[in-house]
Amino acid sequence: MSASDRRRLADQPLDFTITAEERLADGFRPLDRLFVSHASLDGTQRFEGVRREVLRAREAAIILPYDPNTDEIVIIRQFRIGAALKTPNAAALELPAGLLDGDEKPAVAAVRELREETGLEALATAPIFSVLTSPGLCDEVAHYFMCIVDTRGLPLVAGLADEHEDICLLYTSPSPRDS
């Protein structure tokens, strides 16, 4: 991909102003109502008094644990309220993940969350990418990391009791296998 294509396909700055802000709900993810004014994408006009609700969130670290000795990745299954409300499958499959604490760096959070949710230690950690998870709904930024791990001798369940985590660990190959 050319540098021009990378710029064209990247998020872009846009002139905007928050003209009013109201807290609608506190909690794990506070909900705010904002009134904003912003320039149109082509710069020919300005939209005024646009109402938007946004969930406020801390940044998150999401981990892809990979064991090169077994060519397996670790995924987890746990109860998720969003899955329970939208599907018959409340025990959702996902990658280990968690929120950054205070001014914690994303890579440090990735190593900590990997240990808390799987019992695994990161032998090496590399950033993959960062993304806004759902920019029309919330301000959460998720930082993805690859962590090299050794899965030998690990239990099939993990999680922190004080965070009400009941996590099942699953191991699977990222490569297609013959049936």
Label the predicted regions.
Residues D26-N69:
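Acidic, metal-coordinating catalytic segment for phosphate/diphosphate chemistry
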Residues Y171-D178:
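Conserved small/polar residues in nucleotide/adenosyl-binding loops
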Residues P30, V36-L41, S134-P155:
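Active-site-adjacent beta-strand/loop module that shapes the phosphate/pyrophosphate-binding cleft
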Residues E104-C147:
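A contiguous pocket-lining binding segment that forms or flanks enzyme active sites
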Residues S2-R7, R52-A57, L64, N69-R112, ...:
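Conserved Nudix-box catalytic region and its N-terminal flanking loop in Nudix hydrolases
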Residues P30, E59, N89, C138-V141, ...:
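A generic structural signal for well-ordered coil/turn residues at beta-strand boundaries
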Residues P68, L100, A122, V149-D150, ...:
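Hydrophobic pocket-lining residues within nucleotide cofactor-binding pockets
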Residues S2-F16, A20, A25-F28:
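Alpha-helical and coiled-coil interaction segments, frequently adjacent to or embedded
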